[in-house]
């Protein structure tokens, strides 16, 4: 069974998430790794785990991935939405 994942991708400044721009996505995948792979295919960016977030190879962007919670995440506008 596939799970929905909420993903935020943003820029970094000084190694920290900056949020001067952000894209939000809902991706359906079988696992967290599957969600990262789907994000990589769609964004064209390779990601590596840095504990609780994922960093791009350049370190200029980061992604936060968690399970989608309709009560909390439904108010956002999504750039990618696999719920349909």
Tell where the protein language model's regions lie, with residue ranges.
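N-terminal cationic leader/targeting segments used for protein routing and processing
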Residues: 3, 29-31, 58
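Short aromatic-glycine-(Arg/Gly/Cys) micro-motifs in beta-strand/loop hairpins
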Residues: 1-22
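A short, exposed loop/beta-hairpin motif centered on an aromatic-Gly-Thr core
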Residues: 18-33
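Short amphipathic, charge-patterned alpha-helical segments
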Residues: 35-40
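Generic structural motif
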Residues: 10-12, 30-32, 71
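Short, mixed-charge low-complexity intrinsically disordered segments
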Residues: 45-84
